[in-house]
Amino acid sequence: MQLNSTEISELIKQRIAQFNVVSEAHNEGTIVSVSDGVIRIHGLADCMQGEMISLPGNRYAIALNLERDSVGAVVMGPYADLAEGMKVKCTGRILEVPVGRGLLGRVVNTLGAPIDGKGPVEHDGFSAVEAIAPGVIERQSVDQPVQTGYKAVDSMIPIGRGQRELIIGDRQTGKTALAIDAIINQRDSGIKCVYVAIGQKASTISNVVRKLEEHGALQNTIVVVATASESAALQYLAPYAGCAMGEYFRDRGEDALIIYDDLSKQAVAYRQISLLLRRPPGREAFPGDVFYLHSRLLERAARVNVEYVEAFTKGEVKGKTGSLTALPIIETQAGDVSAFVPTNVISITDGQIFLETNLFNSGIRPAVNPGISVSRVGGAAQTKIMKKLSGGIRTALAQYRELAAFSQFASDLDDATRKQLDHGQKVTELLKQKQYAPMSVAQQSLVLFAAERGYLADVELAKIGSFEAALLAYVDRDHAPLMQEINQSGGYNDEIEGKLKGILDSFKATQSW
């Protein structure tokens, strides 16, 4: 078959008419230097602060320095094979992580990818890691408690839903243990938990996950991990990623608790990034915006009002407030709470629980120093019974500390002073508690009532622990309905007082101490 020139020209015209030109514009640049996880890129004219930059090998970097003729970015992940001259391009997106109920019970990395070997994560969408904290009008005052299960904390340093309470102390003083027990105590409270591990050993995190699983708390918890072996960028971003996952519950009228363990390591990772980006160093070589690093994170922990939740859910959730409670952890060096990062975080948070090495080594665990530990807003959230019974405990300990210091110099003490010292010692002994053994409100109330009303006066100091164990076993066996009532209502009146008194009288009558 032969084609003539007319047919050929017609075919060419048809092909030209069918040809569809699709031009894809993208902002492309070239890597000019790579050093310690920081890359400098030339040619990205329209790059945003915090934008994700696509790198070869399906990796990303985040733009942190926008300069006149170059962009400084940190690589999220391995960077050994990146080289000068490689092409990169802008994505037009800022970093987002998966959020939703499907993450509960899972261990994920900073980017929300599963690392527990249980298959892909089910999620309800993505949320930006950086978000603006709710404004003053959108917030509600803190008036509901978060029970940690520790007598020393729930009585003297109460924490409310939506509060930021700092846990501060030297290494090996029980900071993580306190936070993990707080998570374990939320098993049946309905509070969802997020545990963010920053710069820790993988073996330590594995142990924490195992303990949560053993105590039935993992199914209620999201574990976000940036180990010590991961890049500084992932350690710096991990708390923001965990916060975005916690905000999912807060914004839908639920309560969540987030632990940042610990923010000292995040500040060190950020310092490393800033120095590599050639930002000017300040005090302790930290950059000038290290306060903002933590304030913008911790301000996102809040109790939001009914209107905020209704507006966010477009009317699907009505009449509910949401909260995100934060327990950031800071590690001090030789008890120096006046260092740069500790003072910053103390000024941002609503109180601090100070754990002391000397107390820990002398067997007082949790090693809470009641003198400088404080909760600025939690008192309003305390249950009625705890508020009534805890006042005398703090006073007794304050008097005991004062007299204990004085009694070292005085040889003979009068009876009143000796009684106060004895009572203070017994209260200190009573506030000791084993790890992974959180107590209910009713159990704590009964024990505090015994201390407050002088039922420990004739109990030897060495037998306080066994007295408490026997008392709790006795009430669980013979007075379970009353304990259940106190746990549910948290109320305190003459009737409950009379019943508690009756329990202790009958217990002491049946057993000799």
From Swiss-Prot:
It is an enzyme of class 7 (translocase). It is found in: Cell inner membrane. Keywords: ATP synthesis, ATP-binding, Cell inner membrane, Cell membrane, CF(1), Hydrogen ion transport, Ion transport, Membrane, Nucleotide-binding, Translocase, Transport. ATP binds at residues 169-176. It holds the Pfam family ATP-synt_ab_N. Its main location: membrane. PROSITE patterns: ATPASE_ALPHA_BETA (PS00152). The record marks 373 as: Required for activity. Gene3D superfamilies: 2.40.30.20, ATP synthase alpha/beta chain, C-terminal domain, P-loop containing nucleotide triphosphate hydrolases. Its EC number is 7.1.2.2. It catalyses: ATP + H2O + 4 H(+)(in) = ADP + phosphate + 5 H(+)(out). It is a peripheral membrane protein. One of its GO terms (cellular component) is proton-transporting ATP synthase complex. InterPro entries: ATP_synth_asu-like_sf, ATP_synth_asu_C, ATP_synth_asu_C_sf, ATP_synth_F1_a_nt-bd_dom, ATP_synth_F1_asu, ATPase_a/bsu_AS, ATPase_F1/V1/A1_a/bsu_N, ATPase_F1/V1/A1_a/bsu_N_sf. GO terms for molecular function: ADP binding; ATP binding; proton-transporting ATP synthase activity, rotational mechanism. Produces ATP from ADP in the presence of a proton gradient across the membrane. The alpha chain is a regulatory subunit. F-type ATPases have 2 components, CF(1) - the catalytic core - and CF(0) - the membrane proton channel. CF(1) has five subunits: alpha(3), beta(3), gamma(1), delta(1), epsilon(1). CF(0) has three main subunits: a(1), b(2) and c(9-12). The alpha and beta chains form an alternating ring which encloses part of the gamma chain. CF(1) is attached to CF(0) by a central stalk formed by the gamma and epsilon chains, while a peripheral stalk is formed by the delta and b chains. Belongs to the ATPase alpha/beta chains family. PANTHER family: ATP SYNTHASE SUBUNIT ALPHA, MITOCHONDRIAL. This is ATP synthase subunit alpha. The gene is atpA.
